[in-house]
Swiss-Prot record:
GO terms for molecular function: O-methyltransferase activity; protein dimerization activity. It comes from Mentha piperita (Peppermint). Its EC number is 2.1.1.-, 2.1.1.232. This is Flavonoid 7-O-methyltransferase 1B. Gene3D superfamilies: Vaccinia Virus protein VP39, Winged helix-like DNA-binding domain superfamily/Winged helix DNA-binding domain.
Length: 344
């Protein structure tokens, strides 16, 4: 091995040894609200100013910001012309940090490390087990409440931020998919946030948010959204289109087939469709900038929900065909997930 290659390999090994640090420090920055502060200021901020705003040591904060700037989360900049900082170091937001604000994916980052097993923590024991209850066993969310470290508010905020970002991508990059659609059922739609965004963007839609009775009982009224309680394993309300967002990756292939059969029964045979919004993993080397995140999400599902998984195109084709659909189309929406249209 050439000396340079060996040096690069050694550096990579060292980086893996400290790999947990990046996730931990990014989470800390979000907890302190640093991305939001830099975004709201709209101009570079000095370390003393930033330290005062978040009530922490300027020296320690500088070391953290130096680390995050190296990794492209923030950027070190020259002091603005009107600065009176006396040689202080200044930092500004980046496109990445803008995605880490509370209105973007910041709440999702805060979820990391709060689960019973840290999200994505796949141990040798995990790989050896043929059956193990994960974070949620048999769809029983009560276990979430039992862990003193785990906060249901953090979890809900994280899921809401994920849904908000993905729904925005659906609206921007898949708007044509809702043309001519009169009614839409969001299966497992929780409190209706994604559906309310879709109804607002496409006001001709009649939105039906379908979830378990205990979820529907806690939902607040939303304009253009009707809440219906039930089980997706039994029957689903009739509509022109059924949507499954972040649902099927929680379940085994066999369970997915059963869910998809119920969805197929709910839509018109000639003009209906089922929209699946989930990750599609690339295995042919033609992935995009989200491939690494999709693979990370897959092992996170393995760690926290034993049957959960992200699927490849071939794996999606298998369960869709098994459920009896005539054909399906995968559409890129420029985010972690894709839209899969399945036609009965």
């Amino acid at each position: 091995m050439a000396p340079k290659e060996d040096s690069l390999a050694l550096a990579e090994a060292w980086n893996h040894g400290f790999g947990f640090i990046k996730t931990s420090i990014v989470k800390t920055a979000v907890e302190l609200g640093i991305p939001d502060i830099l975004e709201s200021r709209g101009a570079p901020v000095s370390i003393p100013e930033l330290a005062a705003a978040v009530d922490c040591s300027a020296d320690r904060l500088y070391r953290v910001m130096r680390f995050l700037a190296y990794h492209g989360i923030f950027k070190r900049t020259e002091p603005p012309p009107e600065s009176t900082g006396g040689g202080s170091v200044y930092y500004a937001q980046t496109l990445v940090s803008r995605r880490l604000t509370r209105e973007n994916l910041g709440p999702f980052v805060l979820l990391q490390g709060t689960m019973r097993e840290p999200s994505g923590c796949v141990t040798a024991e995990t790989l050896r087990m043929s059956k193990r209850p994960g974070l949620v066993d048999d769809n029983d969310s009560d276990r979430l409440y039992e862990d003193p470290v785990f906060s249901m508010k953090v979890f809900r905020d994280a899921m809401a931020s994920h849904a908000r970002m993905t729904t925005a991508a659906v609206i921007e990059n898949y708007g044509e998919g809702f043309l001519g659609v009169g009614s839409l059922v969001d299966v497992g739609g929780s409190y209706g946030m994604a559906l309310s965004m879709l109804v607002k963007a496409f006001p001709w839609l009649r939105g039906i948010c379908f979830d378990l009775p205990e979820v529907v009982a806690r939902a607040s009224p939303l304009k253009g959204v009707e809440f219906v309680a039930g089980s997706m394993f039994e029957s689903i309300p009739k509509a022109d289109v059924v949507m499954l967002m972040f649902v099927l990756h929680n379940w085994s292939d066999e369970e997915c087939v059963e869910i998809l059969k119920r969805c197929k029964d709910a839509v018109p045979k000639n003009k209906g469709k089922v929209i699946i919004i989930d990750a599609v993993i690339d295995e042919d080397g033609n992935g995009d900038e989200f491939t690494g995140a999709r693979l990370g999400l897959d092992v996170t599902m393995m760690a926290n929900m034993f049957e959960g998984r992200e699927r490849t195109y071939v794996e999606w084709a298998h369960i869709i065909n098994e459920a009896g659909f005539r054909r399906h189309v995968v559409k890129n929406i420029k985010t972690l997930e894709s839209v899969i249209e399945a036609y009965p």
